[in-house]
Structures are given as structure tokens and as C-alpha cells.
Amino acid sequence: MLIVFSGLPGTGKTTIAKGLAAKVGALYLRIDTIEQALRNSGALAHEVGRSGYMVANALALSNLPLGRTVIVDGVNPVMESRTAWSEIASKAGVELVNIEVICSDKSEHQRRVETRPGDVPGLTPPSWQSVLDHEYEAWADAPFSIDTALMSPVQAVSIVTQHLIAGRG
């Protein structure tokens, strides 16, 4: 199974995705970590662009056929990145579960963005203005959605787990 968490920075994707990965023993791929490793390597002359997503796609595709559940944590702001995950799941012959994480309380979302510590060495967390300006296309087909303004991270992991179990039933 390929589980892809999407949403703007500061919505709670990482907290929920890590919690779920620990709970189910899944392989966890975080786009921010991959992109920062690419920057740190000095291999790229310019901004990372889509290369972080391409690395994550390849890592997912190499692990899914081994029977591993893979959880991806990234903004996935455009149709191109979302379509790529669908293609990876199809190539691997596994189910794709898209989960969009939102925070409907704008003040709470801003507070999270402005107060969260950076947890990827070398990566400066985004500013609130950069989150507001971030490209984020509407979904063609609405995915399963979690609103972190309405629940704790523990509750969110529980709801996602229930959704995954119900989808297999």
C-alpha cells in the first residue's frame, strides 16, 4: 500500500505521517528530508525543483514490490506530483491512499508555522507568507481529508488508521 500525505506546510502532515508510520511499521519518505539532502550534496547547480519528488518516487517503487507499506510526506501541490504517485502505485500493483491534511483555523495554522522548530538540519522552516503564497492546486478528485484544527495528532492517526482498515474491508 502507498499512503501519500499532502497539504500545505504547518498543517500537521509530518506529525500524522510519522505517527502512522510508527504504528504500522511502514517505510517513511519525507520530501523535505530528501530535498535538503540533495541541497547538502552540492550535486545540483540550481534549486531542487521536482528532483526530491523523483527520488521519493524511485524509493517508493523499489520498496512497494517487497511488500512494504510506504508512507510519503510532502506538500504534493500540483497535479503532476499527485499523478506520479498514482503511476507508482499502479506500476507496483498496490493500492494508493491519498490523504490531504488541512488546518481550517487560519490563526492556528499561522501559529504553528511561526512557532515550529526546524527538524531537518539545514532546512529553514517556511514563513507564514511563503505558506500563503505556496502553489497548491485543487484536487480533481477530493481525497480523504483530515482537519487538524478539529483534532489532536493522536486522534488524527486513529482516524486515518480506521479509514485504512475500512478501505480493506
What does each model-identified segment do?
Residues L2:
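Walker A (P-loop) ATP-phosphate-binding motif of ABC ATPase nucleotide-binding domains
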Residues I159-G167:
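C-terminal alpha-helix
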Residues T11, T15-L66:
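Conserved substrate/cofactor phosphate-moiety recognition/catalytic segment
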Residues T115-I159:
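Small-molecule kinase domains that catalyze NTP-dependent phosphoryl transfer to phosphate-bearing small molecules
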Residues F5:
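Hydrophobic anchor at the beta1->P-loop junction of P-loop NTPases
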Residues L8:
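P-loop (Walker A) phosphate-binding loop of NTP-binding proteins
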Residues S51-L96:
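Glycine-rich phosphate-binding loop used to anchor ATP phosphates in small-molecule kinases
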Residues A92-R112, I146:
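Conserved phosphate-donor/acceptor-positioning beta-strand/loop module used by diverse small-molecule
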